[in-house]
C-alpha cells in the first residue's frame, strides 16, 4: 500500500473517530486510534502513517514518536482534509 493512500485512509479514520476541539479542529486521542479494530486492520504501521501525515502537514501532534500506553492521551489534530 502506498503512503499517500494510507494518509488518506488515516484522515477518514480521524473523521470517523474524532471530534472538534476548542479551536474547531478535528482531533482524536492516539489511544483511540491505536485501539480501534478497524484502524488495527487498516494500518500495518499506524505510527509510520502518522509520521508521514505529520511530515506532509496534514496532522499535528506533540512529540516525535508515539508509543502505545505512554502516549494514549496525545491529541492527533487534523490540519487539512
Swiss-Prot record:
InterPro entries in the cross-refs: Costars, Costars_dom, Costars_sf
Pfam family, any one: Costars
Entry keywords, A to Z: Acetylation
Post-translational modification N-acetylmethionine, affected residues: 1
A biological-process GO annotation: regulation of actin filament-based process
PANTHER family with a match to the protein in the record: COSTARS FAMILY PROTEIN ABRACL
Family: Belongs to the costars family.
Stated name of the protein: Costars family protein ABRACL
Taxonomy of the source species: Eukaryota, Metazoa, Chordata, Craniata, Vertebrata
Amino acid at each position: 500500500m502506498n503512503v499517500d493512500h494510507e494518509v488518506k485512509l488515516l484522515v477518514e479514520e480521524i473523521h470517523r473517530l474524532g471530534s472538534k476541539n476548542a479551536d474547531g479542529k478535528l482531533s482524536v486521542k492516539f489511544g483511540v486510534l491505536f485501539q480501534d479494530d478497524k484502524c488495527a486492520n487498516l494500518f500495518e504501521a499506524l505510527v509510520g502513517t502518522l509520521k508521514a501525515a505529520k511530515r506532509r502537514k496534514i496532522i499535528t501532534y506533540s512529540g516525535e514518536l508515539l508509543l502505545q500506553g505512554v502516549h494514549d492521551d496525545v491529541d492527533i489534530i487534523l490540519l487539512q482534509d
